[in-house]
C-alpha cells in the first residue's frame, strides 16, 4: 500500500514514521500487559499466578489490542476500486503471474537478490524477537517484569531509530540505510554474546533496538522502489513470503547449536551469522538512483 499512499520522495520517511508508530503502540501494549496482568493480575482480576493465568491472559489482551487498532485502517485507508472478478479466477491469475515472473527470473534478478538477502537477515531479526527474552532470562536471570520493561526500552529505542533514519532513507538511499542498520545490529549482538554484567546487557540491548526500526522500514521502502509498478502487488507478496518462508530455520539452528554446545551464548551466535550473511548478500543488490528532493 505504501507506494500508492505517499509520493516517492517521502516513501522512506513515511515507512520509518509508520514503523515508529507501531513501536509506540507496542510500548503502550507492553505497559498495559505489565500493569494489568503481570504486576496486578491477581489483585485486580483474580488471576492465579501459580498456574500462570496472568501470563496467558496477556496473549488475549494482545489479540484484542491488535483487532481494535486494525479497525481504523480498514475503515479509513483508501483502497483500489473493487474488482468483481471471482475469487477463484483471481487466485488462478495470480498464480499464473507468479509463474511467469519466476520464468523471467533473469529480468528480475536484482529483486530476487534483495529478497534472498532480506530473507536471511529477517530470520536473524525474528530470532532476536523470539529468543531475546529467553536469552535474557536464561543467561542474566531476568524475571517477567524485567523482561517486559526491557522490551519497552527496546521499543523506545527502535521507534527513535525508525524516525531518525527515515530521512537517511530518502536522501542517501534504502540500501545504504539497510547496510548501516545491519552493521548497527551486528556490533551490539557481538557484544551481547560476551558481556557478563547485566548492566552492559541493557546498554548493548538498547543500542540494538536503535537499528530494528530502520532495517525493517528501509527494506519495505526498497521493495517499493525496486518493484515495477504493474508488479507491485506480486512483488510485495513475495516480500512478505520471503519474511516467513524460512522463519523456522533460524530457531532450528539456534536450538541445535545451543544443545550441541550446552550454551545459550553460543546458540545465539546463529543470529550473528545470519546478520553477516544477509549483509554480504545486500552488497550485491543494485538500488535505483535515489530520489532527488529538497524537502
Regions found by a protein language model. Give the residues of each.
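Multi-pass alpha-helical transporter architecture, strongest
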Residues: 65-76, 269-295
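Juxtamembrane intracellular "pre-TM" segments in multi-pass secondary transporters
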Residues: 78-116
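Helix-loop junctions at membrane interfaces in 12-TM secondary transporters
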Residues: 193-205
Amino acid at each position: 500500500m505504501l507506494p500508492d499512499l505517499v509520493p516517492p520522495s517521502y516513501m522512506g520517511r513515511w515507512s520509518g514514521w509508520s514503523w515508529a508508530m507501531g513501536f509506540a503502540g507496542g510500548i503502550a501494549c507492553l505497559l498495559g500487559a505489565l500493569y494489568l496482568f503481570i504486576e496486578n493480575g491477581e489483585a485486580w482480576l483474580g488471576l492465579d499466578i501459580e498456574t500462570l493465568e496472568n501470563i496467558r491472559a496477556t496473549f488475549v489482551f494482545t489479540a484484542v489490542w491488535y483487532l481494535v487498532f486494525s479497525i481504523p485502517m480498514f475503515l479509513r485507508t483508501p483502497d483500489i476500486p473493487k474488482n468483481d472478478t471471482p475469487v477463484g479466477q483471481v487466485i488462478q491469475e495470480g498464480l499464473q503471474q507468479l509463474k511467469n515472473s519466476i520464468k523471467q527470473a533473469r529480468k528480475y534478478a536484482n529483486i530476487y537478490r534483495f529478497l534472498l538477502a532480506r530473507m536471511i537477515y529477517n530470520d536473524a531479526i525474528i530470532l532476536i524477537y523470539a529468543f531475546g527474552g529467553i536469552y535474557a532470562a536464561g543467561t542474566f536471570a531476568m524475571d517477567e517484569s524485567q523482561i517486559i520493561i526491557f522490551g519497552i526500552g527496546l521499543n523506545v529505542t527502535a521507534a527513535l531509530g525508525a524516525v531518525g533514519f527515515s530521512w537517511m532513507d530518502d536522501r542517501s538511499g534504502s540500501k545504504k540505510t539497510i547496510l548501516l542498520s545491519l552493521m548497527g545490529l551486528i556490533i551490539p549482538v557481538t557484544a551481547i554474546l560476551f558481556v557478563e554484567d547485566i548492566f552492559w546487557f541493557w546498554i548493548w540491548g538498547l543500542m540494538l533496538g536503535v537499528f530494528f526500526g530502520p532495517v525493517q522500514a528501509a527494506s519495505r521502502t526498497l521493495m517499493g522502489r525496486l518493484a515495477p509498478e504493474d508488479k507491485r502487488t506480486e512483488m510485495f507478496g513475495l516480500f512478505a513470503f520471503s519474511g516467513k518462508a524460512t522463519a523456522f530455520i533460524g530457531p532450528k539452528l539456534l536450538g541445535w547449536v545451543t544443545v550441541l554446545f550446552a550454551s545459550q551464548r553460543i546458540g545465539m551466535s546463529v543470529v550473528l551469522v545470519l546478520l553477516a550473511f544477509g549483509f554480504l548478500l545486500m552488497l550485491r543488490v543494485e538500488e535505483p538512483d535515489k530520489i532527488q528532493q529538497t524537502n
